[in-house]
């Protein structure tokens, strides 16, 4: 599979069977000049409703017709506000199988509200089985004990986790989460987008290397095979 990182928590995964876009944040994202209208994902996954994960949902929907997977409140909002009927509500612990893979919604310790301040439902992460690969996007979160269940139930190949601190866990919270999940590779998200999220990536890499975990820091716009 190929992963493209657009900065912050926005990334795309492409396999032979499907293209998945996560948490579309482009227009106000200082790390990318990508026009969301140029993307054509088959599936759009949204972890929660905060503006830095949701603000370009409408632009993506106008350009393509993806299946939207998210919590009940977000999928209802997408249907009612944008007139988009290709939705799959998926609350925490729920799962759905598709011909291209499997998606399960996981807990995330965070908050969620739409840009207008209305309730955005419960935030989530996602575990995805894509062929032989298992991907865990934690979503915006702090460490929580049930992360160990993810590690017990799946052999996670790639874990994507926030490291920017302040609004989510920082480097050492992400390391503690990694110790529970035991993935093959960790990719950092949610850093250096705004001044409160300035992150020492050398410290991130050093801490994980010392603990024996492989990491990969993507440049914004970078695509790599994983």
From Swiss-Prot:
Entry superkingdom: Bacteria
This protein's record includes keyword Nucleotide-binding: no
Disulfide bond entries: none
SUPFAM superfamilies in the record: Metallo-hydrolase/oxidoreductase
Alphabetized GO MF terms: hydrolase activity
Keywords noted in UniProt: Hydrolase
TM region(s), chain numbering: none
UniProt family annotation: Belongs to the UPF0173 family.
PANTHER family per the UniProt record, alphabetical: UPF0173 METAL-DEPENDENT HYDROLASE MJ1163, UPF0173 METAL-DEPENDENT HYDROLASE MJ1163-RELATED
Name of the featured protein: UPF0173 metal-dependent hydrolase SRU_1937
Source organism per UniProt: Salinibacter ruber (strain DSM 13855 / M31)
